[in-house]
Amino acid sequence: MSTAIAQQKIRIRLKAFDRRMLDLSCEKIIETADNTAATAIGPIPLPTKRKIYCVLRSPHVDKDSREHFETRTHRRIIDIYSPSAKTIDALMKLDLPSGVDIEVKL
């Protein structure tokens, strides 16, 4: 049997359409973790998802005339090792932009 102690970890997944807003949110989270003596690893970039929508330009006849729109979803992961109660409280009070989706796993 292994005698290694399981280390506690928080995994934060971030998603956003705007890459700059996502990077600013990652910087805030890492800065908060560093200020509370926790170890932050990341941000680890995940593949960007592209969703393309094809729409007819004309409401009536011209099927050959189409327009394409796309949305890009940028994603990042941040791992925080050995978090304290102070770290968790600071992360809960953190004010992040509304365009960033955050998922936290303990």
UniProtKB/Swiss-Prot annotation:
Coiled coil: none
Keywords for this protein: Ribonucleoprotein, Ribosomal protein
One GO CC term, this protein: ribonucleoprotein complex
Pfam families in alphabetical order: Ribosomal_S10
Gene3D superfamilies from the UniProt entry: Ribosomal protein S10 domain
One GO MF term attached to the UniProt entry: structural constituent of ribosome
Family annotation (InterPro entries): Ribosomal_uS10, Ribosomal_uS10_dom, Ribosomal_uS10_dom_sf
Gene Ontology biological process terms, A to Z: translation
Record function comment: Involved in the binding of tRNA to the ribosomes.
Family membership noted in the UniProt record: Belongs to the universal ribosomal protein uS10 family.
HAMAP family per the UniProt record, alphabetical: Ribosomal_uS10 (MF_00508)
Record note on quaternary structure: Part of the 30S ribosomal subunit.
Name listed for the protein in its UniProt record: Small ribosomal subunit protein uS10
Organismal lineage: Bacteria, Bacillati, Cyanobacteriota, Cyanophyceae, Synechococcales
